[in-house]
């Protein structure tokens, strides 16, 4: 940094903190290169970008930087930089619409950097993303574009991973992480500009952030807010944000031919694989993007396509084909492989790459070279039914808006083709116009806890863009009251305050905070980490029997939670190499991730003064204590064996469920606690552990009040017996 810049940084008042110290925020901030804060011109910014030294750290630019700069200046958004700066200078809030591929996610934050001069005012620019993958991937790209180290001037912050530091000026972060930051700093005072990207996705966290930004705009007139969307339906955003001005930038799009199937496909996965191989053999050059619904489906498709493509290459029937998966829990280094060059053409045919992705590739990431899109028309969506208190990820038809976004991926570099694996009639008549906002289809317990921590007590009149159903809100308040996170007046309790500090669902947080009462907080910490990462068990189609046999080595007869602990203890006892995991059909990646999550949660426990203790392993109550701790957080997720002995019935909600096929219980206990309710062809409960019914009335007497079970005589009768037994035990203890 130049001496003049250092001096300015030390001497200038921070205009962003004027609302805290009543300082004069009219002081002009000027860089040593003549750029004036919030008055920078395109010519000045372009000159600063051209060096010879980096504007933000004064280091010489690399040769690669100038090549990337040329590419950046060809992006559609760059052509409207001047128009953007004019609107940005004149308004506090802007709604910005840029189609995917326009460059908005990478360029707009950089335009803002050269105008805000955060390195002179000790502030930062935040750019939120709905997905972890996008936050990491875009931060890496922008760090390369700015010729800085990732984690220095440009960083990212996602749940359980903070890659930023004291020098960070631009931070890409998940919307959930900015929301967590607002819980400790209601004014978000470190930021001079907050950019909410991919707002059209309407995630729960983005919707709450929009409400907060609206409140903050009046309290912090110095704060600039940009709401960015990839869809042209921006009027709703404009109206919500005080009729904010709109700037729209077209993407670089070529015409895309849409093909539909003649008849509905019975197996969309098989149809997708068939279509990919057909494109590879018969169509002209260009890469392929396939949309599937989740990790298991994607990995399975990658294996099958690779095997088939290798056969085609050996037979000389097609050119080389590289297949890459893309989904949220994929490690960053593997995510980046989607940007690797396409294989070279051969005499047998064109070289291609195939990216098989979840809906993250709809708008969050742009992959150059895609000419063909295969769209089966499905995605996994969170669905919540407040009446039966069940939240589940369901494979559901996408919306028309999503279908259009997917098709648009094919026309980025040349005319493309989109193969929709459904009929045109289904597109017109069966697909809804827009995906429902997440706030209308989610359990709101975590959100209510966050809003309470943010100091928002009137949840009903909070300015939601789309207000949630009153029943959903009441269910959330009721659940938090039963967990003792909210008192009867709806105010945060000491336990609720602690729970809000953990980046966990309330029931997991409560279980962790209460675990010292059962002398097993070390074990519950490990278990919480394991429940916060993808499945540690690997069960490939080609070796299911062997994988199941290996799992038996770790299986605990009393339940899946204890089985998970056995896996973790074996992993940590020095066994946990990548080879050991491979041989035991365990995900090395998930176990490493669980280890990192555990470290982060442990730090939070230390800050919140939650004691770390264990029952000695040889104590007969070692596993009993862990099971009791499970009940302390998950007493609302309990099921009792039904009268016929074949199924289970959930408490209060009377849902008939079966144990998931992955369940490792050696017998079917009378009472179980479960982590997940899974809806597929029928209702399953997953991650199940046996419990004793007397623990329910001991640890959650308010929830297990007999008067609340009038609609389920079978369960009420069983609970009455438990109460009678408890009363007899108490009476005998007094003698």
UniProtKB/Swiss-Prot annotation:
InterPro entries (UniProt xref): DEAD-box_helicase_OB_fold, DEAD/DEAH_box_helicase_dom, DHX15_DEXHc, DNA/RNA_helicase_DEAH_CS, HA2_WH, Helicase-assoc_dom, Helicase_ATP-bd, Helicase_C-like
Subcellular location: Nucleus
Motif (DEAH box): 197-200
Pfam families in the cross-refs: DEAD, HA2_C, HA2_N, Helicase_C, OB_NTP_bind
Composition skew (Basic and acidic residues), residue ranges: 1-12
Keyword Nucleotide-binding in annotation: yes
EC class: hydrolase
Catalytic activity: ATP + H2O = ADP + phosphate + H(+)
Region Disordered: start-end pairs: 1-34
GO cellular component: nucleus; post-mRNA release spliceosomal complex; spliceosomal complex; U2-type spliceosomal complex
Primary role: Pre-mRNA processing factor involved in disassembly of spliceosomes after the release of mature mRNA.
Protein family: Belongs to the DEAD box helicase family. DEAH subfamily. DDX15/PRP43 sub-subfamily.
Full protein name: Probable pre-mRNA-splicing factor ATP-dependent RNA helicase prp43
Organism: Schizosaccharomyces pombe (strain 972 / ATCC 24843) (Fission yeast)
Lineage: Eukaryota, Fungi, Dikarya, Ascomycota, Taphrinomycotina
Encoding gene (name): prp43
